[in-house]
Amino acid sequence: MSARWIGAVASVALLWCNGAVAAETRAILLRGWLGLFSGGLDRLAEELSAQGVHSEVRKHLYWTTTVTDILRDRAAGKIGMLILIGHSQGGNDAIEIAHALEISHVPVDLLVTFDPYGQKPVPANVVRAINYYQNGGWGLPLIPAAGFHGKLSNIDLACDPDISHFNIEASGRLHAEVLREVGAMRQTNVPGAMQAKSRRK
């Protein structure tokens, strides 16, 4: 076996390993109405980035472009676990993204919404969904769509006088909860593992 052949095999193996490592946890955070609010998502994105999560904040109006980007990067092996986070209208459109991804059988490992309103049900490709809202305010509880086998939590913050629709996404306490959820998810799960298990039942 020649040294040149061995070197070629080693190079291919190295490229394969680099491609595997390139699959990263991706978090996309969607601002509320027209992108004028939801400044707290910038801070949450920084906190997620500090945990090693590739995070970016976008305006909710461009959610269809976000779907295209996710499908492209996932096909290229760049996305492992996928996290969608949205505030207000951004929460609604985070769910819209999940529905669009369901068509292509792409799982969403974690969906977090802050006080969405008038939203669609959570689709079956979502593994874990957390909704922070205030009963009697603008936000509403999330409901599961047909075929949903993930875990859905609606957390009512109506009794917290320090939280409103306009600052809920900036709460340090809620950020800490989201960060803990992300950390636990990355330690215990592979991308979409729970979703695949649910489909086998």
What do these predicted regions represent?
Residues A23-G80, S164:
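Active-site catalytic motif of lipid deacylating hydrolases and related acyltransferases
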